[in-house]
Curated annotation (Swiss-Prot):
The lineage of its organism: Bacteria, Bacillati, Actinomycetota, Actinomycetes, Micrococcales. A zinc finger (C4-type) spans 56-71. InterPro entries: DNA_Rcmb_RecR (IPR000093), Rcmb_RecR (IPR023627), Rcmb_RecR_Znf (IPR015967), TOPRIM_dom (IPR006171), TOPRIM_RecR (IPR034137). Residues 79-174 form the Toprim domain. The gene is recR. This is Recombination protein RecR.
Length: 199
């Protein structure tokens, strides 16, 4: 264990998601050895993002304005909303260039072990968006893990009573994958999500 400022830096870096003790130590020593101007730019970038970036008042995506660029874009279809867990998921969907609707960022997923229930997510804001009657379909695009599935099921059951079409992203076998290596859940989902071979 180091002393003083070095250990404090390692500890703070270790609090970042996905950064373990070894990575935190490597990052800390990289910072110590880096050019001071590079570190000044890093500090300025972090400070700027904390000062200027906020969440879109409509969808919850990151933005520097009141509304994000997707909510401001009149070419987007306002009748379809893709519900995702985090802002980074918006970017992942956008990279596909397959979706031209709008988004709703929940800010996480239901995770009782971590103390995250529906009330900690932006579900109330989603329901508010549905009040105007313009939305015809909700696409649930949560992660295909336990928390994402719990969140998707919760949303689907809740939205079913409203009478809006609720769909879930298909999941199954990856392109180029081998059946023999697929786990049972993935293979089962592939069967459930099968479609006409000629469509």
């Amino acid at each position: 264990m180091y002393e003083g400022a070095v250990q404090e830096l390692i500890d703070e870096l270790g609090r970042l998601p996905g950064v373990g003790p070894k990575s935190a130590q490597r990052l800390a020593f990289h910072i110590l050895e880096a050019d001071p101007q590079d570190m000044k730019r890093l500090v300025e970038a972090i400070t700027t993002v904390k000062e200027r970036v906020k969440f879109c008042t409509v969808c919850g995506n990151v933005t520097e304005q009141e509304l994000c660029n997707i909510c401001r874009d009149p070419r987007r279809d306002p009748s379809i909303i893709c519900v995702v867990e985090e802002s980074k998921d918006v970017l992942a969907v956008e990279r596909t260039r397959s979706f031209r609707g709008r988004y709703h960022v929940l800010g996480g997923a239901i995770n009782p072990i971590a103390g995250v229930g529906p009330e900690q997510l932006r579900i109330r804001e989603l329901l508010t968006r549905l009040n105007d009657g313009a939305i015809q379909e909700i696409i649930i695009a949560t992660d295909p893990n336990l928390e994402g599935e719990a969140t998707a099921t919760y949303l689907a059951r809740m939205l079913k009573s409203i009478g809006i079409t609720v769909t879930r992203l298909a999941s199954g076998l990856p392109v180029g994958g081998d059946l023999e290596y697929a786990d049972e859940v993935t293979l089962g989902r592939a069967f459930e999500g099968r479609r006409n071979a000629l469509s």
